[in-house]
Regions:
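Cytochrome P450 fold signature focused on the C-terminal beta-domain
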Residues: 216, 220-226, 283-293, 306-326, ...
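Conserved cytochrome P450 K-helix/beta-meander segment immediately N-terminal to the heme-binding cysteine loop
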Residues: 336-363
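N-terminal membrane-proximal hinge/A-helix region immediately C-terminal to the signal-anchor transmembrane segment
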Residues: 1-95, 110, 114-122, 157-158, ...
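Cytochrome P450 catalytic-core helices
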Residues: 143, 260-287, 382-400
């Protein structure tokens, strides 16, 4: 069995294009090779196959036996820890997913609405609305406060103030493919270089998290509290065991980083799209003034289609995959190229146009709209993120009527 055709260029050239111009790189590959192709990055023992046909994606995600692709642990484990939900597989992953799911769905999730509104309105009060300012950093501030309040129950205090700064540093070093590439390249320099400095900052963040865990364990009202850390401390696996401090640290770091940066970026992209499409912005404002949220939901769905924050969500095949004319052997690393699926003209007419109305009548197909991945590894906080985006967008657009921008030029 042979893999789909491989992208042009050396492994180093491919990874540099991926790091600096990922969408242009994927679009060129689609035009040259079609719905599936392979890439080869330095340091990985085999190519990775990228797919974009929904039928192939469904076949991949429906099989629970598939594992994590190569490279995920290399990038994430030093930061999130080996027990992180994002790095667990099989029964270990499902057990942790069951314990961590409740706060991010249903009534428990909706109970955070007032807190979210308070946080975003306090943030708006600090904005210099008489001049231009970057929105992404302001969305990071909002979503970080929300996740801190959800995880710890409070967001004040000197320890959490220091933790904010530490998390910002960790994100700066790990959030983009470019920074991940630099980190991978400099880890070999023991005792010096950017990676050694980053490790010191990460240890300082760990000290703060362990101090919060220790303080929480001493709380006499632990069973009455509704914050996520208290819930995780009280949770028990099927064998009756509780999470250790090390595992709590890993899950907290996962929630604090993954639980706010992706939402902040999605919000920033949504504002970017709205401010480049005045008619859509005007229609959204009018619908919110009328107390109707259908267009708001459609706007978020369309934004996540055009600007998915996570580009890949793959698997290592545990068994042979047959789909979309492909036959791939067990052991192959396969990932949906999310943006390519989202911009397929056969699925979405005018695929590069921002048209929220395309989602007013019908929800997207499960395997043609995958900003949160899919299958048993679909993002734990997907519902929470969309809920948070609705509240933040509604509050800002209701209060701020002078939002504008100077340019809509794009570079992908």
């Amino acid at each position: 069995m042979t893999l789909p055709p491989e992208a042009r260029g050396t492994p180093l050239g491919q990874v540099l294009r991926w790091a600096f111009r990922p969408l242009a790189f994927m679009q060129e590959c689609r035009e040259r090779y079609g719905d599936s192709f392979s890439v080869r990055f330095p340091g990985f023992e085999r190519p990775m196959v990228l797919i974009s046909d929904p039928a192939a994606i469904k076949a991949l995600y429906m099989e629970r036996a598939h594992g994590l692709p190569a490279g995920r642990n290399i990038v994430l484990e030093p930061v999130l820890g080996s027990r992180s939900l994002l790095l667990q597989e099989g029964a270990e992953h499902l057990a942790r997913r069951r314990l961590m799911l409740p706060p991010f769905h249903g009534e428990r999730m909706r109970s955070y609405e007032e807190t979210m509104r308070e946080i975003v309105n306090a943030e708006i009060d600090s904005w210099p609305l008489d001049r231009e300012f970057p929105i992404h950093s302001r969305m990071q501030a909002v979503t970080l406060e929300i996740i801190l309040r959800a995880v710890f129950g409070v967001s004040e205090g000197p320890r959490l103030d220091r933790l904010r700064g530490m998390l910002a540093t960790v994100l700066q070093e790990t959030a983009s493919p470019r920074s991940q590439l630099i980190g991978l390249a400099t880890r070999r320099f023991e005792g010096g270089g950017p990676w050694a400095k980053f490790e010191g900052q990460l240890r300082a963040a760990d000290d703060l998290l362990y101090a919060e865990i220790a303080e929480h364990r001493e709380r006499p009202d632990l069973e009455e509290r509704d914050d996520i850390l208290s819930m995780l401390m009280l949770a028990r696996f099927e064998d009756g065991e509780a999470m250790s401090d090390t595992e709590l640290r890993d899950q907290l770091m996962t929630l604090l980083l993954a639980g706010h940066e992706t939402t902040a970026t999605a919000l920033a992209w949504t504002f970017d799209l709205l401010l480049c499409h005045q008619r859509a912005l005007d229609r959204l404002r009018a619908s919110l003034e009328g107390g109707e949220e259908g267009y708001l939901r459609a706007t978020i769905t369309e934004s996540l289609r055009l600007r998915p924050v996570v580009p890949l969500a793959g698997r290592r095949l545990a068994k042979k995959l047959n789909a979309d004319g492909l036959t791939l052997p067990a052991g192959t690393d396969v990932t949906p190229a999310i943006w390519l699926t989202h911009t397929c003209a056969d699925i979405y007419p005018e695929p590069f146009a921002f048209k929220p109305e395309r989602f007013l009548e019908d929800d997207p197909d499960t395997y043609a709209w995958i900003p949160f991945g899919g299958g048993v590894r679909r993002c734990l906080g997907a519902s929470f993120a969309e809920f948070e985006m609705r509240i933040v967008l509604r509050e800002i657009l209701t209060r701020c009527d002078q939002i504008g921008r100077a340019s809509c030029r794009e570079r992908v």
